[in-house]
Amino acid sequence: MGDLDLCRERTRWFPALVSNHVVDMINKYPREQLPEALTGYITDRTGYDYHHHAEVGSSNAAFVGDEVTDRFCVLGSVDDHRRKLAELAEAGVDQFNIYLMNGDEEEQLEIYGREIVPSFLRVSGTA
């Protein structure tokens, strides 16, 4: 949470990790049945080294650009997090997983508990 460029660098590993599942889907289903928004970002993927799986700064994520990172992740300021989570809720998402493996984990969890989750409790009446 915080500076957008730093957030992107700390979370770029996640869309890289997801790319393994996208490759599996492409191998199982006809590509034309899958949305380009999901499959298009892996065209520059050259491989994946599981020795650096889910690792911040891993070369596995070199093919993942800012646009893809922004689309796959919740990044930026507290207000940015609230805004993106509200957009996801409007789209029908009712669960959200916080990956506490990007640095400042305790601070992120504290901010979510203090500033983000309560704002959704006021809106929905539930967590």
Language-model regions: role of each:
Residues 70, 96-98:
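Hydrophobic faces of well-ordered beta-strands that scaffold small-molecule active sites
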Residues 25-26, 42, 98, 111, ...:
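Weak global preference for isoleucine
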Residues 105-126:
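C-terminal helical cap(s) of enzyme catalytic domains, especially alpha/beta-barrels
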Residues 74, 101-107:
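Acidic-and-aromatic substrate-binding clefts and catalytic sites of carbohydrate-active enzymes
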Residues 1-90, 121-126:
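An alpha-helical appendage that flanks or caps ligand/catalytic pockets
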